[in-house]
Amino acid sequence: MKNIIVTCFFVLMQLGILVHAQTNTTTDIYQKSQDGYACFRIPAIVKSKAGTLLAFAEARKNSCSDTGNIDLVVKRSEDGGKTWSRIITVWDDGDNVCGNPSPIVDQETGRIILVSCWNLGEDHEKQIIDKTSKDSRRVYVLYSDNDGKSWSTPKEITSSVKHPDWTWYATGPCHGIQLQGKKNKGRLVVAANHMVAGTKTYHSQLIYSDDKGETWKLGGIVNEHGGNESSVVELKNGYLMLNMRNYNREESKTRSYAISKDGGETVSQMSYLPELIEPICQGSTLNYMKKGKISNNILF
């Protein structure tokens, strides 16, 4: 792919989430065994319309396990990442799992929309996939109208974005986007993945909202298997690129991608990016903005 800047990085969430300032100093945003939590994982960060940095994470109460008591939290920085606020609880549902943050900033209203997932704390991913769990994965949306200082009650949107025969489901984990192109300007788009009942293979998909996050629709689904944790970026030509963690190692040991030409409603066949070798890991995708406009440069 031409005119693409590729920056590969892997964030080790077990020890903490780091922000690198221009002075080459580091600030620990989250550290394990602090603030009443054993571990912090699954990061997402956005800049609000007011310029505040919002760093989301799963706050895992008792261990680094993917199951059990997991809360969604955020920290705020009003000075470009030099200092950070105390932990703000976005969603705490007792002993259950609240996770996979996918935040989006509405640049028109300033509202911060957060799409995320839930499951019973006692249900493990394998049980959910095998349909032996007590419940399943559910999808919710929350929002903040005061720059991330407080958050709404979660609203369930599962029936709008998840087929009944899907077992596992996960949003992101990464930021979502608000489209800038003329055709679908203002649309909110989030990348996600799922598994169909009776199978053991992941597929990626897009979900979108045309009313500022009030209602959501299921968009394009990648037919080829292997796509897992995903991120989405808007390209200069108005297309969207869905970039995916790849479990189909027989095809390629690199990240995979698919293109949407209609704002996320449908997606192309899966292809692979030979430049992006990965060990099956979450990865973020960003468009490098130039003078406030979308450019040809993409950061991975």
Predicted regions, residues:
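Asp-box/BNR beta-propeller blade signature and adjacent active/binding-site loops
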Residues: 22-300
